[in-house]
Amino acid sequence: MQRITVLGATGTIGVNTLDVIARHPERFSVFALTGHRQVDRLAGQCRQFRPQVAVVADAAAAGELARQLSGMNVEILHGEAALVAVAASGSVDAVMSAIVGAAGLAPTMAAVRAGKQVYLANKESLVVAGRLMMEAVAASGSRLLPIDSEHNAIFQSLPADFSGDLDASGVERIVLTASGGPFRGWSAQQLAHVTPEQAVAHPNWVMGRKISVDSASLMNKGLEVIEARWLFNAPPGRIEVIVHPQSVIHSMVRYRDGSVVAQLGVPDMRTPIAHALAWPERMDAGVPALDFSLLGGLTFEKPDQEHFPCLGLAFDALREGGDQPAVLNAANEVAVAAFLEKRLAFMDIPRLVQKAMHQFAGRVSNSIEELLELDAEVRRHLLCSLAN
């Protein structure tokens, strides 16, 4: 039986993870659940899964959770140190890293350094600290299994014995598919008037607000390009993005002999979650079978980088190296939050990100602490700029 900590249990990935775990009580035992400030949802999850530990953001949330779980034998902790503790605990075999944003970086690194099997849904761990994260994986013997549908699809489409050498495996290119988001085909005039309500309405996937905006701007795909570089040791010139509006093909691998291997499925995050949790086996995810007779057609087109420049900015950050991906990520988080609060126009998101990349060019951090300091510095600078 696998003992697991779920970081970010109350978010979309966390909820889907627990849905899969609930289908296989004989395989999994939940050691810890974390839920930031969604106390009501976390309390319900604690009643169902009976973890030994629950972690929230602060003392106020911890007090409310304790009140709701009165009489239950669960240790309630709060703060980043508690997240790190449950991620690295000797009582767990594996960690689902599903906290959104840079807040997930420290506990994910702690899990890796402790040699855990890490189910990686937190993009920022590789976007912000890819080099450091992969060095830690190599040093500790940890294993990263990707949860993003695209990276999980690539993982499934590569040879089972893939060891990080594309040439040795006969791989030409990795192809990430993108839905194109809700604004695919829109004009510049239309994009100038996009509202947060429109941006969070993804055509194919059920996701959180931040990642929905990233999908709409194609920044999500840009972050995935950076992740793919580290997960599969793929230079930017061997990563390709294609728009596939139906979201049935989740990603592909082009091989030297002309073959293309793809992973298909109904757009449901429980599939990649179940694949990772059961790897190298397979188990039921509760997902309906893909009915080819109902598909109609599968279409593809090049991404529109003129109207959606965030994808190009991510490639730029990857090529420039150093801390540019971390700067891009921090700036994007600030910009998206401002957009959701209706303080920034949708098309100003890439402008703000590009401005930050110019202002913080040339930085190179050599520790998680330095990266987090840079992250905070970028955020402070941009928040001050927005306030003025």
UniProtKB/Swiss-Prot annotation:
Q: Which GO terms describe its biological process?
A: isopentenyl diphosphate biosynthetic process, methylerythritol 4-phosphate pathway involved in terpenoid biosynthetic process
Q: What class of enzyme is it?
A: oxidoreductase
Residues where NADPH binds: T10, G11, T12, I13, R37, Q38, N122, E124, G208
* Keyword Metal-binding recorded: yes
One Pfam family recorded for the sequence: DXPR_C
Protein's job = Catalyzes the NADPH-dependent rearrangement and reduction of 1-deoxy-D-xylulose-5-phosphate (DXP) to 2-C-methyl-D-erythritol 4-phosphate (MEP).
Protein name as annotated: 1-deoxy-D-xylulose 5-phosphate reductoisomerase
- The organism named in the record is Laribacter hongkongensis (strain HLHK9)
